[in-house]
Design a protein with these regions (language model features):
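Short, functionally critical alpha-helical segments immediately adjacent to catalytic or ligand/cofactor-binding
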Residues: 300-316, 351-355, 378-384, 442
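A ligand-binding cleft/hinge motif common to bilobed small-molecule-binding domains
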Residues: 108-117, 164-165, 188-223, 390-391, ...
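Extracytoplasmic small-molecule ligand-binding "clamshell" domains
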Residues: 3-15, 24-109, 113, 117, ...
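Export/targeting segments at the very N-terminus of extracytoplasmic proteins
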Residues: 264-314, 348, 365-366
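Periplasmic-binding protein-like
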Residues: 51, 124-135, 202, 206-245, ...
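Extended ligand-binding regions for polar small-molecule ligands
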Residues: 8, 23-30, 69-77, 136-160, ...
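Catalytic and substrate-binding regions of cell-wall glycan-acting enzymes that process beta-1,4-linked
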Residues: 377-448
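Substrate-binding/active-site groove segments that recognize
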Residues: 318-342, 347-360, 415-418, 442
């Protein structure tokens, strides 16, 4: 019997060791010529991407977005640098895969079986719905039979493939495809009335509705679609295994959940009238106060300070609430006194005091709070008080969450109204649900303001170019006929060229190319696990979310 027990023990030990070895080999089939071995030996993960709602370049020329941070996390997990090449269209990123110029294609891409002959996909990490959108104020189609106008989609996408399938059911369905416009540009064209319909995913639509509230959803397609990364098809699966391992760890560490909260949670609901009122106020009211927001914003983005003020008072310097808070930043008397503000109804004084108070709160926050999250903790304290903010952090820890992550803490804010929770806390009852909505609203307004100002700047830039071109065309210096009357020669040209409708000068089958400014700085970005840089300039460091594994204790 003892020998039998020993034999069982030996078998168990051998089985465990074999399982460990096999498990590592399945996860990391690291032969000398494997793709993952090449990536690690070269010290570089090559990503080919298209500007999209999931990966983009912000105002500071920094790469941002869900896909960007995820790619950065994967490169950090492998212990290599990240090289991202931004391409102008989807076809080029798949060409990069086929030609061996990229390891992974990233662009908020939906699973598309038409691509599987030459590519394969990694794990899916988001689910979206394809939606047909139209311009608010026009007739809402109830099905594809009701399409009456120009339907435009980006070529090479799952949306184009979907329309090809739908054409079998709707033989009269017509559409156009283009590789010259980004997702955001097509949605902007729809908002401006240049096209009538497009098919897009629910995330892109939700984000752009904050900037162009005229975008309206006609109906959803029934099936959800997975968002995924693409790789070149081959018999060698080492990169697939590494990706699967990384995504499993990302789920365990809640990296995916945190990124979803950071980029998308605040746009889950949409109020057309509220957004329209805000957009109109950007044009009509903001110019009066923008210099003051810029002057006193200190360490935060002035547009975020403006969004806070809109949430507080709708940019009304005389606003007063029943609780006694007053002014554009709705300061209490004690707060105003602490910040040295004598007149809360003076717009400049109010903005100065509000900005100073936010900076004061930020300085008081524990250093353990993640950098990206500090402003949201500060805003919750601005709304309900610093003590209640500390209480909800304590409650979060009591309930097993991370008190230093806004993702965990905001979920517990509504619990401050429940006696079984607030009775255990230092400062007691608080309207935590209001603080939750307060922060989410500010995030939405900030996103709307940033996006709308960028869109307006691009349009003005295009208009300026058109005006310069028109001036050149009709300038007397450019008239070729000697002695011709300038006014006689200018008139016909002026009548033919409409600045508003310059796009109409192009053939309907040839869409104009994207201007360099609108391509969002196409090019190469070489990123180490702890910094972001292009090939000639080094920018500010970008923190990488930590991911750990038994083999990769980074």
């Amino acid at each position: 019997m003892n020998n039998l027990k020993v034999n069982y023990l030996i078998i168990l030990v051998i089985t465990l060791l074999a399982t460990m070895v096999i498990g590592f080999n399945v996860r990391w089939p690291n032969t000398q010529d494997s793709q993952i071995n090449r990536i690690i030996s070269q010290g570089e993960l090559r990503i080919s991407a298209v500007s999209s709602p999931l990966i983009y370049i912000d105002e500071q020329k920094q790469l941002r977005g869900f896909d960007y941070e995820l790619a950065q996390g994967f490169a950090s997990y492998l212990g290599v640098k990240l090289k991202i090449t931004i391409r102008p269209n989807f076809e080029q990123i798949f060409d990069d895969l086929e030609n061996g110029d990229a390891d992974i294609a990233v662009a908020g891409l939906l699973y598309n079986k038409e691509r599987l002959a030459k590519t394969k996909t990694g794990p899916s990490y988001l689910n979206v719905t394809q939606q047909l959108v139209y311009r608010k104020g026009t007739t809402r189609p109830k099905s594809f039979n009701d399409i009456d106008g120009k339907l435009l989609v980006t070529s090479g996408t799952a949306h184009a493939s979907t329309l090809k399938e739908l054409a079998k059911e709707y033989p009269n369905l017509k559409w156009e495809e283009t590789s010259q416009y980004t997702t955001n540009q097509i949605l902007e064209m729809l908002a401006d009335g240049e096209i009538d319909y497009t098919l897009e995913d629910s995330i892109a639509i939700a984000l752009q509705q904050r900037i162009h509230p005229q975008i309206a959803v006609a109906f959803d397609l029934l099936d959800d679609h997975a968002v995924t990364w693409y790789m070149r098809r081959s018999q060698e699966n080492s990169l697939d295994a590494a990706l699967l391992d990384f995504f499993n760890l990302s789920n365990e560490s809640e990296l995916l959940a945190r990124l979803n909260e950071k980029y998308f949670s605040h746009v889950e609901s949409f109020d057309y009238f509220d957004t329209m009122a805000f957009i109109k106020a950007i044009d009509n009211k903001l110019p009066d106060y923008q210099p003051l927001f810029e002057k006193y914003a200190q360490e935060i983005d002035w547009k975020l300070l403006a969004a806070i003020a809109w949430q507080e008072s709708h940019w009304d310097p005389l606003a007063t609430s029943p609780t006694g808070v007053r002014g554009l930043m709705m300061l209490t008397k004690p707060t105003a006194a602490t910040m040295g503000i004598a007149d809360r109804l003076d717009a400049e004084e109010s903005i100065k005091g509000g900005a100073a108070y936010i900076a004061y709160i930020m300085d008081r926050l524990p250093e353990s709070i993640a950098e990206d999250d500090r402003i949201w903790f500060a805003l919750s304290a601005y709304n309900m008080g610093y003590g209640h903010m500390q209480d909800v952090r304590k409650l979060t820890e009591m309930l097993g969450g991370d008190p230093n992550r806004w993702f965990d803490v905001k979920a517990r804010l509504p619990l401050l109204t429940q006696k079984k929770y607030y009775s255990q806390l230092t400062y007691g009852y608080a309207r935590g649900h209001e603080a939750y909505r307060y922060v989410e609203n500010i995030r939405r307004y900030h996103q709307s303001l940033v996006g709308y100002l960028q869109s307006r700047e691009r349009k003005q830039h295009t208009l300026d170019i058109a005006q310069k071109s028109l001036t050149y065309l009709i300038s007397p210096d450019n008239l070729k006929t000697t002695g011709a009357n300038p006014t006689e020669n200018q008139s016909p040209i002026t009548e033919k060229v409409s600045i508003k409708n310059l796009g109409a000068m192009s053939s309907s089958n040839q869409t104009p190319k994207i201007h360099n400014m609108e391509k969002l700085s196409l090019g190469h970005y070489l990123i180490s696990p702890y910094s972001l840089q292009d090939e000639t300039e080094t920018d500010n460091p970008v923190p990488v979310p930590p991911l750990k594994s038994p083999d990769n204790p980074l």
